[in-house]
Curated annotation (Swiss-Prot):
GO terms for biological process: methylation; protein histidyl modification to diphthamide. The gene is dphB. CDD domains: DHP5_DphB. The keyword Nucleus does not apply. Gene3D superfamilies: Cobalt-precorrin-4 Transmethylase, Domain 1, Methyltransferase, Cobalt-precorrin-4 Transmethylase, Domain 2. HAMAP family: Diphthine_synth (MF_01084). It comes from Methanospirillum hungatei JF-1 (strain ATCC 27890 / DSM 864 / NBRC 100397 / JF-1). S-adenosyl-L-methionine binds at residues 9, 85, 88, 113-114, 165, 202, 227. InterPro entries: 4pyrrol_Mease, 4pyrrol_Methylase_sf, 4pyrrole_Mease_sub1, 4pyrrole_Mease_sub2, Dphthn_synthase. It catalyses: 2-[(3S)-amino-3-carboxypropyl]-L-histidyl-[translation elongation factor 2] + 3 S-adenosyl-L-methionine = diphthine-[translation elongation factor 2] + 3 S-adenosyl-L-homocysteine + 3 H(+). Belongs to the diphthine synthase family. This is Diphthine synthase.
Length: 252
């Protein structure tokens, strides 16, 4: 059996009791570290807490070479751990399909997701979000405009946008970097983004949430990762009041 377990957003305490029990009963435990990481803990602490060895997976291990995972699931109980929820803003549906095609039973144990956390921390109503996007670190001759196109298309439809910020090995994009990259993409055009909301360390005891113009957010110390960015559309009255009270938003 292959069991997908969501670890939640921040630290060891975010996992559900069901998820913890699944780990204890597992014959093999895999941890993917490329879609999200729990910055409130370490892999060593996780191994100690769970009493299990964790097999660390990179993107290519899951998307291109999943055979060790599937073999473990054929021979016993394999648990696949991921930050957040296993099937939200991930490509893990493909792994579940592969398992099903090989006759391997599967199960999902959900975890708290950044998608619901964003709505809770910002007060932006969840049904008003459009397509999300991701901002990658640019590479030589590669600086995709897709994130900006997605944001502008959502704004035209009066929809909010969740903007995921790049996660690389020992490198985590900040709110400031994300805004600066969007501004570079808008250079020489008439496009503009009047309002941003930056969030840091969702799920922790002291998350940072700040709303305002790009100039204001560049002055905010968001602190350590993980960060995420939101571009709101026009605000409903309750949304505006929420941001005023909990994100320091000043519409003036």
């Amino acid at each position: 059996m292959l069991i997908f377990v969501g670890l939640g957003l921040y630290d060891l305490d975010d996992i559900s009791l069901k998820g913890l029990q699944a780990i204890k009963e597992a014959d093999a435990v895999f941890l993917e570290t490329y879609t999200s990481v729990l910055t409130g803990t370490t892999i060593e602490q996780m191994r100690e807490k769970y009493g299990k060895d964790l097999i660390i997976l990179k993107r290519q291990d899951v998307e291109q070479k999943p055979e060790p995972i599937l073999t473990a699931a054929k021979n016993g109980i394999a648990v696949f751990l991921t930050g957040g929820d296993p099937m939200v803003s991930t490509t893990h549906a493909d792994l579940r399909i592969r398992a099903h095609e090989q006759g391997i039973p599967t199960k999902i144990i959900h975890g708290s997701s950044i998608v619901s956390a964003v709505s809770g921390l910002t007060g932006l109503q969840n049904y008003r979000f459009g397509k999300s996007c991701s901002i990658p670190y640019p590479a030589p001759k590669w600086f995709p405009k897709t994130p900006l196109d997605t944001i502008l298309a959502n704004l035209k439809q009066n929809l909010h946008t969740i903007v995921y910020l790049d996660i690389q090995e020992n490198r985590y994009m900040s709110v400031h970097e994300g805004i600066e990259l969007l501004e570079k993409l808008m250079e020489g055009s008439t496009d503009s983004i009047p309002l941003f909301v930056g969030i840091a360390r969702a799920g922790s005891n002291s998350p940072v949430v700040a709303a305002g113009s790009s100039e204001r957010l560049k002055l905010v110390d968001f602190g350590p990762p993980l960060h995420i960015l939101v571009v709101p559309a026009s605000l409903h009255e309750i949304e505006e009041e929420y941001l005023k009270n909990f994100a320091g938003y000043d519409p003036q």
